[in-house]
Amino acid sequence: MANQFIFQDVPQRNLATFNPEVGYVAFIAKHGAQLNFDTVRFFFLNQKKAKMVLSKTAQPSVDLTFGGIKFTLVNNHFPQYTANPVPDTALTLHRLSGYLAKWVADQCKTNQIKLAEAMEKIVMPLAEVKGCTWTEGLTMYLGFAPGAEMFLETFEFYPLVIDMHRVLKDGMDVNFMRKVLRQRYGTLTAEQWMTQKIDAVRAAFNAVGQLSWAKSGFSPAARAFLAQFGINI
């Protein structure tokens, strides 16, 4: 008797239903009481290593522990799992990164004591390698965190303009900006903030432009790209 092979459809990720704010509330409800700056420090210092571990682990769900706190992540870094559906309230490494960055921002924005503790303990490698330190401000420094683009209002458009500079300075494919260009700014849709918040975007862009990484000149193509966002150099 011949072998029978039955193929069924695999549900695709429905990005339209994912609301980062709702996901963050669920994350805080589950992990908020345990979170501390040491855990955040361990996470960001080991995020690259964690991504590598996930890419080599053939398990759709993986438990990772940072600073004594266990997080169960949907593994969308293993090659065969990149298209697997992710429930709206589930954690991925990217979402965890954004949630932790927002948690730090929420803890520190009106509390100088906590801000001083965060500045002492937390290191954001992606910011440091670009010459950005805590002295540039909470929102710019944490805005370098992967996933921070989910919270453009919290991080004052810095994740967006950091990606702009990556396109201009590092040669990052502009298509990678599709994710940040879909995000909301508070209650504003992407279509709304792109017309109503141009001045805020320009201010954030110019602030990042003061970093040594971003100070070199702009090509004509780069100027044309920036003009699409109302930024004229």
Curated annotation (Swiss-Prot):
GO terms for cellular component: helical viral capsid; ribonucleoprotein complex; viral nucleocapsid. RNA binds at K48, K51, N76, H77, R95, V123, P125, E128, R166, R182, Q183, R184. GO terms for molecular function: RNA binding. It comes from the Viruses. Pfam families: Bunya_nucleocap. The keyword Magnesium does not apply. It is found in: Virion. InterPro entries: Bunya_nucleocap, Bunya_nucleocap_C, Bunya_nucleocap_N. Keywords: Capsid protein, Helical capsid protein, Ribonucleoprotein, RNA-binding, Viral nucleoprotein, Virion. Homotetramer. Binds the viral genomic RNA. The N-terminus and C-terminus are involved in homooligomerization and play an essential role in viral RNA synthesis. Encapsidates the genome protecting it from nucleases. The encapsidated genomic RNA is termed the nucleocapsid (NC) and serves as template for transcription and replication. The NC have a helical organization. Belongs to the orthobunyavirus nucleocapsid protein family. This is Nucleoprotein. It comes from Aino virus. The gene is N.
